[in-house]
C-alpha cells in the first residue's frame, strides 16, 4: 500500500513540475542593463538618461533584463530561438524603454530568467 501511495505522489509531483515549466507569463517593464542597475555604479541606471550607457554595456556583452513595472523586480532576459546570443539581440532596440514581453519563466538559485518568445513596445 505504501508503494502505491509513493507512486501516486511521485507522478503528481512530476506532473505539477512539468506543468509549471510550460507556463508562459507576460510582464511589462523597462529594459535595463543588469550590471549598472544592480551595482548602482551609474546612479539610478534607468530611463532615457541611461540609454547610451546601457546600449554600450549591452554591446559589450552585459546581459539585459526587465525591470518589472508592477513589482519592481528585476528579471534576467534570455531567449530560446538564438540562445548563444542571449536576449540582447532581441532587446537592443528597446533599451531604456517600456516593453511587454511574453515567455517562459524559470528560476534557479534565486535568479529568475524569462525565456522571451515575444517583445513589443508597451503602450
Where would I find each of the regions flagged by the language model?
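Bacterial N-terminal signal peptides
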Residues: 5-15
Amino acid at each position: 500500500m505504501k508503494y502505491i501511495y509513493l507512486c501516486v505522489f511521485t507522478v503528481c509531483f512530476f506532473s505539477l513540475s512539468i506543468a509549471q515549466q510550460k507556463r508562459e507569463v507576460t510582464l511589462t517593464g523597462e529594459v535595463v542593463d543588469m550590471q549598472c542597475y544592480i551595482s548602482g555604479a551609474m546612479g539610478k541606471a534607468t530611463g532615457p538618461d541611461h540609454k547610451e550607457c546601457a546600449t554600450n554595456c549591452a554591446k559589450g556583452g552585459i546581459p539585459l533584463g526587465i525591470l518589472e513595472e508592477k513589482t519592481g523586480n528585476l528579471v534576467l532576459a534570455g531567449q530560446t530561438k538564438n540562445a548563444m546570443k542571449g536576449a540582447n539581440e532581441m532587446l537592443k532596440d528597446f533599451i531604456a524603454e517600456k516593453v511587454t514581453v511574453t515567455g517562459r519563466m524559470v528560476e534557479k538559485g534565486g535568479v529568475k530568467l524569462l525565456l522571451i518568445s515575444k517583445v513589443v513596445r508597451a503602450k
